[in-house]
């Protein structure tokens, strides 16, 4: 758990490079997320299974890593403006769509807005680039579960319904996140 938690923390600390006006996403931010989860749980925290606690800790650390954008990732995002994600972004942000149609350029503001709106989707890219510790999988905590939980941070809760998870309550974890 510690290895992936630190990976999430280290990526979260780099968010400030791409979003210089955002709150620092460092240990304090992650501790605050954990504190809120703890407060929301109240006495029910004693009923959590070990795998649920691990999922919550990892989600606290990794839920915003989609906002961590390396220079290479920034260039890739800017050069792929013909994807359905960009088309959807322009559809829901018509002023940006009109500006892009007019200039053919993605401004830094547009790129940041696109990443902010889609950061929950980018979690998969970030977590898939990290070797997953076999010990986590052996304990029933696989990468796809964490990705799904982190992505729920930006999706309706019903995306987790009928998920087939019987070992833990992924819906509860998502609500706490």
Question: Where on the chain are the PLM-derived regions?
Answer:
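Active-site flanking loop/helix segments enriched in acidic
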Residues: 6-32, 106-110
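C-terminal effector/catalytic modules and regulatory tails appended to multi-domain proteins
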Residues: 1-3, 177
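Conserved helix-loop functional segments at active or binding sites
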Residues: 39-45
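N-terminal, well-ordered alpha-helical segments
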Residues: 31, 35-38, 54, 58
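Short basic coil micro-motifs at the edges of alpha-helical modules that engage polyanionic partners
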Residues: 22, 45-46
